[in-house]
Swiss-Prot record:
The keyword Ribosomal protein does not apply. Its EC number is 4.4.1.3. The gene is dddY. The keyword Lyase applies. This is Dimethylsulfoniopropionate lyase DddY. Belongs to the DMSP lyase DddY family. One of its GO terms (cellular component) is periplasmic space. Its main location: periplasm. It is an enzyme of class 4 (lyase). The lineage of its organism: Bacteria, Pseudomonadati, Pseudomonadota, Betaproteobacteria, Burkholderiales. Catalyzes the cleavage of dimethylsulfoniopropionate (DMSP) into dimethyl sulfide (DMS) and acrylate. DMS is the principal form by which sulfur is transported from oceans to the atmosphere. It comes from Alcaligenes faecalis.
Length: 401
């Protein structure tokens, strides 16, 4: 008995030592900045709220829900042909999520070491990062100091229907991102209400504003994402103990009365819904594996041509209603086809609302990283009319194990 106890103590000590001995290698573009003591305090507040966000994300993954005893239960297909129902899985059963959790634990165990890879991105060179509005900028001294260009100015200059949607989202960003409820699955409020320095200081990207293949003008102007941790985020860790870090964690905002067309990508992805819907069917989404027999697949040189026919209201059985309690967590396997649809029900009458989520990917250092949009079967002229009920084609590409 004593030997078993001693063995357990030694094993525990070794495990603790392994965590404490973690070696962090930052990305090459993370450089020490010469800042004053007062400026460092602003960065420290940004870092402190970032750690809360990452810790809460990890805790939400590992807290049992549904039929899972060791982790959260995630929807991996909103419609499975064999059952006619959604398909779920315990999220920590995926190896990529195990590694993501392992790396987050290393960061949280030794935040001072990990902090060496944290960059407020005040002078980021890769691409322009924005703050939604002056109102959001004024939420924290850190955001004011970083002084990013404003998305309200960006969309004012753009004009037209895209600019109008962008202004609607960003002028009302605080109201939209405050329509959240984190009581069911979080022990801290991870929304802009609980972490104002983080949400106002992280750099926001108008992902589809200048992409003519991305659907309606209102959607193109009404979608933003931000990356806190990952290759293009604030916390840019390349390796921990020689192991590639695939974690890419941030947040997304989609304006109400929009439809994010079918799309797919190589990296696995998770979403945790924060928005409390104002009606049951305010925010719908779907995820189905590319090889689902609901679709038609034809082999191509580098992948598969997947034809989706959601006409005659077939699409409705594929979609589920998102909420902050039950349908709150989803996991997309590689090349899973998914969409976010906020056009039904009260979307025609509400104001200052949308879909706000904690967003993450788990394999940011392998295969192709960019999101691939599906295309209308009718040709380029149908792009602005893309909806789940239209015939769509996805040119899915092979990925390397």
């Amino acid at each position: 008995m004593q030997k078993r106890m001693l063995g357990g103590m030694v094993a525990g000590a070794l495990a603790c030592f392994q965590v404490q001995a973690a070696q962090f290698q930052c990305q090459d573009d993370v450089k020490p900045a010469a800042i004053s003591a007062e400026e460092q305090k602003l960065v420290d507040q940004f870092w402190a709220e970032s750690l809360v966000y990452l810790e809460q994300y990890l805790k939400a993954l590992e807290t049992p829900t549904g039929q899972c005893k060791d982790s959260a239960q995630a929807t991996i297909q909103t419609y499975h042909s064999e059952t006619g129902k959604a398909q779920t899985r315990c999220i920590m059963k995926y190896r990529d999520m195990e590694l993501l959790a392992k790396h987050l634990k290393a960061v949280l165990a030794e935040p001072d070491k990990a902090k060496a890879c944290f960059d407020p991105q005040k002078n980021y060179k890769e691409f322009t990062l924005y703050t939604p509005s002056s109102q959001v900028q004024q939420l924290s001294a850190t955001s004011t100091w970083i002084n990013r260009p404003l998305l309200t100015d960006y969309y004012t200059k753009m004009g037209g229907a895209i600019g109008a949607a962008g202004l609607e989202l960003n002028e009302n960003f605080l109201a939209i991102t405050s329509r959240t409820d984190t009581t069911a699955h979080w022990t801290r409020d991870v929304s802009i209400k609980g972490l104002p320095t983080l949400w106002s200081s992280v750099g926001w990207v108008p992902l589809y504003a200048e992409n003519p293949a991305a659907g309606s003008d209102r959607f193109r102007g009404g979608y933003l994402y931000a990356e806190l941790m990952g290759p293009w985020g604030n916390l840019r860790i390349k390796e921990i103990n020689g192991e590639k870090v695939g974690a890419e964690i941030g947040m997304t905002v989609q304006l109400f009365n929009t439809s994010y067309p079918f799309h797919y990508h190589h990296p696995q992805e998770t979403y945790m819904t924060l928005t409390k819907p104002q009606c049951v069917d305010q925010n719908k989404y779907m995820v189905m594996h590319w090889d689902s027999d609901q679709f038609t697949q034809t082999r191509s040189d580098k992948g598969w041509t997947v034809e989706i026919d959601g006409s005659k209201e077939r699409w409705k059985k594929w979609f589920a209603n998102q909420d902050v309690n039950k349908e709150w967590l989803t996991y997309f396997e590689r090349n899973a086809i998914h969409a976010f649809h906020a056009l039904e029900g009260c979307n025609q009458t509400i104001q200052n609302s949308g879909l706000v989520a904690v967003w993450a990917r788990s394999t940011s250092q392998d295969n192709e990283q960019f999101t691939q949009l599906c295309r209308p079967a009718s040709g380029p002229d149908g792009v602005k009319r893309m909806r789940p009920g239209q015939k769509t084609v996805c040119d899915v590409r092979d990925w390397k194990p």
